[in-house]
């Protein structure tokens, strides 16, 4: 991915890019509670004006607080269930798989088709991490998930939609 990626965005896609930016910027801070290497790696490859996200410190602090809490919960679950299957519902541009991967988990990133299209422009995901482009309200997505071990469902992305 040497060229800059220019995603076509509108509406809630703005929020996912701003959240992605907030995690990347926080990861560069001196006293961070998590380091999001994937966000740091990819944020500069995205051709997008992040100035709104840079100015919105309240939104950024909310993203960071949620990330710290959810990371801890997911980490604890994976430590107890190392061969688990995780479904990240309304994933947006979440990079938690890359922070939590133990080499065994199976991870599904689920979101609306237009969101997954943007995600697929930015991430090259395959193997134990894959994407499902379908509404969380459509029960058909469950047919795409191959369960291995215990299941964890993350709904952090749904908690940010107003």
For each feature predicted by the language model, list its residue ranges.
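A short SAM/SAH-binding and catalytic strip from SAM-dependent methyltransferases
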Residues: 150-162
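A short, conserved alpha-helix within the catalytic core of class I
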Residues: 131, 140-142, 160-162
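Soluble catalytic domains of membrane acyltransferases
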Residues: 142-146, 152
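Rossmann-like AdoMet
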Residues: 1-87, 91-134, 146-148
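Adenine-nucleotide cofactor-binding loop residues
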Residues: 137
């Amino acid at each position: 991915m040497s060229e800059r990626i220019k995603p076509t965005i509108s509406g809630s896609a703005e929020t996912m890019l701003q959240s992605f930016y907030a995690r990347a910027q926080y990861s560069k801070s001196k006293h961070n509670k998590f380091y999001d290497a994937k966000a740091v790696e990819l944020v500069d490859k995205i051709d997008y004006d992040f100035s709104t996200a840079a100015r919105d410190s309240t939104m950024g602090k909310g993203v960071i607080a949620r990330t710290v809490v959810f990371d801890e919960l997911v980490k604890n679950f994976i430590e107890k269930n190392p061969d688990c299957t995780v479904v990240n519902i309304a994933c947006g541009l979440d990079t938690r798989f890359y922070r939590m991967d133990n080499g065994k988990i199976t991870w599904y990133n689920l979101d609306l088709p237009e969101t997954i299209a943007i995600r697929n422009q930015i991430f090259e995901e395959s193997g134990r991490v894959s994407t499902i482009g379908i509404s969380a309200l459509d029960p058909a997505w469950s047919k795409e998930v191959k369960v291995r071990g215990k299941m964890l469902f993350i709904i952090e992305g749904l908690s940010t939609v107003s």
